């Protein structure tokens, strides 16, 4: 007989991109219900303890959060397992630090440091545009937001620029060929490039062909793509590497060059 949601998560079953030690204990933090899927998020306890190293233990994280020191998207969060996800802005006012959660080219979450002006907004992918009671239009975003009376030109798969203080749409990007995107799912997760071609398949998934700034081409599904900006210029700063995935040979050459450059 089922008794509701599981309240625990074994460490071996935790997502690989959390990068937890296999021998660090039997259990991992089970993400709370929230705006992101449990396998596509990073709980606050892992951000504070494992990534930023502001705490050594689980209990230290709880005491930091209970002092209301950590904000996600401009709101104080005290839940230790709150699921922060892609594009979320994590702020610590006491240290004047702001981070945006992005993917690296290996598909792992990366805390990318931000300037103050960039921490005031986030980009949100539009999941659907619908009409509610009395014909009021509203849109749903990838992080569970519902925004009423959007611009009539905004459609599904477009990206909106959201002001985190007022929760209002400042601008939007159409999902078009020629715009820069980041892949948020599949084997190419974390790669950044420009949409070159869009293939429609009746009764199946739409395929996008993307080319990065180095000329590498790859394909992915439509649902795995998040538009970052108009043309080739993204609206948010990107982590080191700019979302370009090197081949094994290119990576080896880069490491050899770095080793030879460092004095013995």
Curated annotation (Swiss-Prot):
One MF term in the entry's GO annotations: structural constituent of ribosome
GO annotation (BP), single: translation
Short name of one Pfam family: KOW
Annotated PROSITE patterns: RIBOSOMAL_S4E, S4
UniProt-annotated location(s): Cytoplasm
Residues covered by the S4 RNA-binding domain: 42-104
UniProt keyword annotations, A-Z: Cytoplasm, Ribonucleoprotein, Ribosomal protein, RNA-binding, rRNA-binding
Keyword rRNA-binding: yes
SMART domains: KOW (SM00739)
CDD domains cross-referenced by the UniProt entry: KOW_RPS4, S4
PANTHER family for this protein: 30S/40S RIBOSOMAL PROTEIN S4, SMALL RIBOSOMAL SUBUNIT PROTEIN ES4
HAMAP family xrefs: Ribosomal_eS4
Protein name: Small ribosomal subunit protein eS4
